[in-house]
């Protein structure tokens, strides 16, 4: 039987069908009647099916809450949650319903889940399958910004650093700024601990580097000799930051600033020495 047109059935036909023993079995397409009701965003039919026992007869391959999370309207999600569906359940792909709300960009549905349980954004069978990381990967600044606003206390720094690494790799400047601003405002124990800049340097992503260099970024975390000799614009940015660190009373005595090969590299190259001198003059 094909149930794909059940949304057009008359009430008498629907009532007769729901009283049959096959009411909640899969049709020829492998779907249940509830699947089609949700797909059509038919709130009334969904309520009828729930009252008839649809949630007690779910197919193994169907996840109504996950499906409803892809809809722009939040009504069916609210109904399913009120009916007792588990918002932390993983589907057969290892994702939560919130993951699909994020995937669809449905901010109102995202808010609905997070207000109920903010920890859902970090639920996933792996760290890469969480709703938070998925929003970062999608470069959805609005959703990530909302997520950050709903976290009551700073979360795992390793997760945050991994997300920042991803934004640098993908060249997502606005997302990187959002995450770095959050990190610097909530983490006070890691001066010059911002993720390494190698990815941005390798990609010659000047826009990303310009954004990164506004923070206390660790310019000493990679081998900079080839960089300094290969790209004049990036070399100038690195030297300017180095001079800034050496002249700042807060950073000049840090081991990373004092014990590095940057000054030696600069001293051996006339062009780099000139850049350095100009930077020093500009700082005084």
Curated annotation (Swiss-Prot):
It comes from the Viruses. Gene3D superfamilies: Ankyrin repeat-containing domain (1.25.40.20). ANK repeats lie at residues 29-58, 60-89, 93-122, 127-157, 159-188, 192-221. GO terms for biological process: symbiont-mediated suppression of host innate immune response; symbiont-mediated suppression of host NF-kappaB cascade. GO terms for cellular component: host cell cytoplasm; host cell nucleus. Keywords: ANK repeat, Early protein, Host cytoplasm, Host nucleus, Host-virus interaction, Inhibition of host innate immune response by virus, Inhibition of host NF-kappa-B by virus, Repeat, Viral immunoevasion. InterPro entries: Ankyrin_rpt, Ankyrin_rpt-contain_sf. Its main location: host cell. It is found in: Host cytoplasm; Host nucleus. Induction: Expressed in the early phase of the viral replicative cycle. Inhibits antiviral activity induced by type I interferons. Does not block signal transduction of IFN, but is important to counter the host antiviral state induced by a pre-treatment with IFN. Plays a role in the inhibition of host NF-kappa-B activation by preventing the acetylation of the RELA/p65 subunit of NF-kappaB. Belongs to the orthopoxvirus OPG039 family. This is Interferon antagonist OPG039. It comes from Monkeypox virus.
